[in-house]
Amino acid sequence: MIAPAKAATELSGLAGFIETYKPILPVPALVAILFLVWLFFRDTWRELDEDALRMRAEIHAEGRMDHRPFVALVLVAIILTMQEYYGGRIYFETTIVPALSKFAERHVAMKLTKYEELYGFGWWAGTRVFGYVLPFALWKIFFRKDSLLDLGLRTKGFFDHAWIYGLFLAFVLPAMLVVSRSPDFGTYYPFYKQSSRSWFDFLTWEAMYFLQFFALEMFFRGFWLGALRRSFGSGAIFAMAVPYCMIHFGKPYLEACGAIVAGIALGSLSMKTKSIYQGFLVHVTVAGLMDWLALRHRKATPLHLWPTDVAPIGNAWLLEQEKREALARTIERTAAGIFAVLFVLMVVMIVRSRLHRHDRLWTLPRTKA
């Protein structure tokens, strides 16, 4: 048994203000944030446009045609369509569950009845990962001379740009802490509604969730931008932000609006750093923390390692809630300590990397033309 999320009328302060003016609030917020994104990434956008202009001129001078936009955009359209119709809950329940049920009759260890929702999200995550990664293999078939590392997979210089990860979180986390109190977010997250049942449920779900995010970053910020940058320049970033926003339709309104900024900002970050890894870290940090905060606001963080079949009642339920709260606080203090240590280590690695390159600590890393 868990506590219900607060109704909109019960919210006060900043959270109540956001809920009241939610329909129009994203407009000025998007304008303000996108202006900051423009200030931070305008040089990156200009470099992308200059590179694309030079590459198109070279192709035109040779009398050739760049088939990359055609191949990339058709692949993206096919994959997103297949995922929508065959990677969701409806297809799983109508087609996959009957097959699983027959298999589960012979293999009772599957515990299909107990974990049917988790199996459903396993299908969802699996189809996403497969669809998002598939273009990389196909790309190597169509364009053998292209390096897959140029599709956002380079790790060189990671620590030179790691400070941007902290900068992004400094902007995103305060806003997330506020909107996480919204009823929309409190009832929507986590996707897997049995996450509070046990740590097995919660951690298994988060592992699938994070793996899906890594594949998503490969697809949108790696494959899409790497394939289209030489033809579209910075326009590839803004073109990518459209379908990226659309895959958020059905999620809370503020999140769907925020996906516009996130798509542009994370895409620009990927183009600046030549990798998807900082964007992935931002994405999973926010997503994992959002799940945790939603459970915390409902007083529904997991307590038991494995699911239990007996629900406590009366005083036993109150005692379990006290244990649940105490465990959650202990985990948060431990996580805060680990994060602080990792932050210090990251700062040390950044300073060492910059000194090794003979860069000043307060300037942006030099970027190649």
Give the ranges of each region predicted by the language model.
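Aromatic-anchored segments of alpha-helical transmembrane domains
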Residues: 77-85, 170-179, 241-249, 284-296
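Function-critical hydrophobic alpha-helical transmembrane segments in multi-pass membrane proteins
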Residues: 124-143, 156-185, 191-249
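Interfacial helix-capping/hinge residues at the ends of transmembrane alpha-helices
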Residues: 148, 221, 225, 263-267
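N-terminal, membrane-interfacial amphipathic/helix-forming hydrophobic leader that caps
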Residues: 1-147, 294-369
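Short, hydrophobic secondary-structure boundary micro-motifs
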Residues: 149-152, 188
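Alpha-helical transmembrane segments of integral membrane proteins
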Residues: 25-26, 67-75, 123, 127, ...
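Functionally important transmembrane alpha-helices
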Residues: 237-241, 246-247, 254-337
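Membrane-interface helix-boundary motifs at transmembrane edges
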Residues: 57-63, 152-157, 225-230, 274
